[in-house]
UniProtKB/Swiss-Prot annotation:
Residues that coordinate or bind substrate: R88
One Pfam family this sequence matches: Acetate_kinase
Active site, UniProt feature: D145 (proton donor/acceptor)
Site feature: Transition state stabilizer: H177, R238
Cofactor detail note: Mg(2+). Can also accept Mn(2+).
Reported cofactor(s): Mg(2+); Mn(2+)
Keyword match Cytoplasm: yes
SUPFAM superfamilies documented for this protein: Actin-like ATPase domain (SSF53067)
Membrane listed as a keyword: no
Keywords in alphabetical order: ATP-binding, Cytoplasm, Kinase, Magnesium, Metal-binding, Nucleotide-binding, Transferase
Family annotation (Gene3D superfamilies): 3.30.420.40
Family in the record: Belongs to the acetokinase family.
Protein name, as recorded: Acetate kinase
Length: 396
C-alpha cells in the first residue's frame, strides 16, 4: 500500500511516504503563516532533495506544494494515488480510545477534546481537513498517542479527585508516546525471538519529552504521563511530578496568572530550569567543565527515571527487559549507565563496552550475566502509524 504519514503542527507539517512499508520520501513544511516558509521533500532512496521557498499562508497551501514536489520528483503521481493517509493525533480523549478511520464524528470529537491538547489537536485537525480537500478519495486514519494506554486499569488511570471530575469532565490519566511504546515493545519481542504475549517490558522513551511505560504481554498497564504530557519524568523544559500545592503558592508569591504558571511548568522548568540547558549534549559538556547545576540537573533526571522504572517492577508480575528509546535513550550512554547502575540490585548488569558503542540499530547492552535484558531500540513512530493505517484500511 502507498501510505502518507502526516504530523501536523501549528506552523509545520512533517511527512513520510511509505510504499509497501519502505520509506521512499520524507520532508517538512515549515514556518506556515510566515513570509519565509519552506517546503523540503527528500527522496530517501537516492538522497535527492526538492525544495521551495515562498509564502505559505495555511496548511492547505503547504500540502498543495508537497503534492507538486511529489510530482516533480516522480515519486508519486498525485496525492489521489495514495491508498491512505495516517495522521498522528496527540489526544483522543475518553471516547476516541482506539485508532480509527476518520469520519464526521471523529473530526468533531478531535475538535471537542482540543481543550486537552490546545497546542496540538487543532493543528492535527487542520492537517486532516487539508488532506480530505486535497485528495477526497483517499482514506484518512487518526492514530492517537493516547490509544495504546487504553488498556490501563481504572485504579491506574484515575486521579483521587471527586468522581464527578472524571464522570462529567473526563479528567483522568491518558498517557502519551503510545505509538512509540507500542512500536519498541513489539520490536523487542522480535529481537528477543519471543511472542509479545509472553513478554513484560519497561519502555523508557527519553527525548525532550520523556515517559516510561509498564507493558505486560503487549499491553500498557501504567505510564508516567497523565492528563497531559506534563506529568511524570523530569524533561527538557517540563517539570514532571511536583506537589500541586506549589502552584497556588507560586501564583501568590510571583503574582502569576494560570497561563503564566502553565508556561512556567511546560517551557521554563525541567533540566532547563535547573541549569539553563535542555540539550543533554550541552549538559554533559557543562558537567565536564565543572558546572554543578548541570550535574544536579542530570542527577535529578536520572533519579526520577530510576524511581519510575523501579516502581514498574512492582506493577508488572515479572520484568523481562528494559528498553531505552528516543533521542536520549538511543544516544546517551551516560544516562543509560547511571540508570542501570542504580537498578543493579534488581538483577540488571550493564555491559559497559556495549553501552558505549555508538552504533545505530537495535542492540542489547546488558552483560551476559544480567538477569534482565537491556535493549536500545530506535523508535519509528511514522512506520508504526503507517502499519496501523494499513491495518485499518484492510479491515474496511
Amino acid at each position: 500500500m502507498k501510505i502518507l504519514v502526516l504530523n501536523s503542527g501549528s506552523s509545520s507539517i512533517k511527512f513520510k511516504f511509505f510504499d509497501n512499508k519502505i520509506v521512499k520520501a520524507s520532508g517538512l513544511v515549515e514556518k506556515i503563516g510566515e513570509q519565509n516558509s519552506k517546503v523540503v521533500l527528500k527522496n530517501t532512496l537516492n538522497n535527492e532533495s526538492f525544495e521551495r521557498e515562498l509564502t505559505i499562508n495555511n496548511h492547505e497551501e503547504g500540502l498543495s506544494i508537497v503534492n507538486e514536489l511529489f510530482k516533480e520528483s516522480g515519486i508519486l503521481a498525485d496525492l489521489n494515488a495514495l491508498d491512505g493517509c495516517g495522521h498522528r493525533i496527540v489526544h483522543g480523549g475518553r471516547n476516541l480510545s482506539e485508532h480509527c478511520l476518520v469520519d464526521d464524528y471523529v473530526l468533531k470529537e478531535i475538535d471537542r477534546v482540543s481543550i486537552f491538547a490546545p497546542l496540538h489537536n487543532p493543528a492535527h485537525l487542520a492537517g486532516i481537513k487539508t488532506m480530505i480537500k486535497a485528495a477526497p478519495s483517499v482514506a484518512n486514519a487518526a492514530i492517537f498517542d493516547t490509544a495504546f494506554h487504553r488498556t490501563m486499569p481504572d485504579f491506574a488511570y484515575m486521579y483521587a479527585l471527586p468522581y464527578d471530575f472524571y464522570d462529567k469532565h473526563n479528567i483522568r490519566r491518558y498517557g502519551f508516546h503510545g505509538t512509540s511504546h507500542a512500536y519498541v515493545s513489539s520490536r523487542a519481542a522480535k529481537f528477543l525471538q519471543k511472542d509479545q504475549n509472553e513478554l513484560n517490558v519497561i519502555s523508557a522513551h527519553l527525548g525532550n519529552g520523556a515517559s516510561v511505560c509498564a507493558i505486560e504481554k503487549g499491553k500498557s498497564m501504567d505510564t508516567s504521563m497523565g492528563f497531559t504530557p506534563l506529568e511524570g519524568l523530569i524533561m527538557g523544559t517540563r517539570c514532571g511530578d511536583l506537589d500541586p500545592a506549589i502552584l497556588p503558592f507560586v501564583s501568590h508569591l510571583k503574582g502569576l496568572t494560570i497561563e503564566e504558571i502553565d508556561t512556567l511548568m511546560n517551557k521554563k522548568s525541567g533540566v532547563y530550569g535547573i541549569c539553563g540547558y535542555n540539550d543533554f549534549r550541552d549538559i554533559e559538556r557543562e558537567i565536564e567543565q565543572g558546572n554543578d547545576k548541570a550535574r544536579l540537573a542530570l542527577d535529578m533526571f536520572c533519579y526520577r527515571l530510576v524511581k519510575y522504572i523501579g516502581s514498574y517492577f512492582a506493577v508488572l508480575p515479572k520484568t523481562d527487559a528494559i528498553i531505552f528509546t528516543g533521542g536520549i535513550g538511543e544516544n546517551d550512554s551516560l544516562v543509560r549507565q547511571k540508570v542501570c547502575e542504580r537498578l543493579a540490585h534488581l538483577g540488571i548488569e550493564l555491559d559497559f563496552e556495549l553501552n558505549k558503542q555508538r552504533i545505530s540499530g537495535e542492540r542489547m547492552i546488558n552483560h551476559a550475566n544480567s538477569k534482565l535484558k537491556v535493549l536500545v531500540i530506535p523508535t519509528d513512530e511514522e512506520l508504526e502509524i503507517a502499519r496501523i493505517t494499513e491495518e485499518l484500511i484492510g479491515k474496511n
